[in-house]
Amino acid sequence: MLTKTSTTIQTTSPTTNPTTVPTPGQIAVLEGVEAWSMESTPADCVRFGIFGLHNKYDIVLSGINRGVNMSGDIIYSGTMGAIFEAGNQNHKGIAFSTTPENVAASVKYLDEAFNFIMNNNLFEYSALYNVNIPEEVKGIKITKQGDAYYSDAFHQVDEVTYTQYGEMIADTCPEDKDRDTNAFYNGYISVTPMTKERTDLVAFEKLKNKNI
């Protein structure tokens, strides 16, 4: 199976899935492997791979991100933006993330997580999956998007400068074992089916008859 890779030259998290129009920035061909690097966003890498290289891919893989992508992180993540862009172009996608300190150690679990998705035919149920790998792995769980697991604050340095920081907090719904945050912090690789659809379908069904 032919594998082709395009990657951003600089880290782009948090960027979700913006694309640069009309040009995605500088593109460089890497020596010795069939791979390209780009000064652009992860979503642009996906678009270049599809439209620039004129290929149809089995699966778009994004990551490993140096930082977990759970709960509200999903909204901001460039790593997630790559698979959402894959979904926009009718491709399957998997995003992989872990803590910054665990990137090298997490590599050994990539095959395990990937094989879990493939061996259980998960793509029959969803085209996009978000995978988060903890430092100590007990197993793998199918999860859903969790609640906030850190607090946000801004610290004023001077009259015109602020710094943003956050602190880890307990899962706001610890009794819900199906959340990605609960699984991750209890030592399980979380595998969350995702969708590119942003419509609130429950509200839509209730409101669609109110048209005038």
Enumerate the language-model features and the residues they cover.
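Alpha-helix C-terminal capping segments
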Residues: 49-54, 81-92
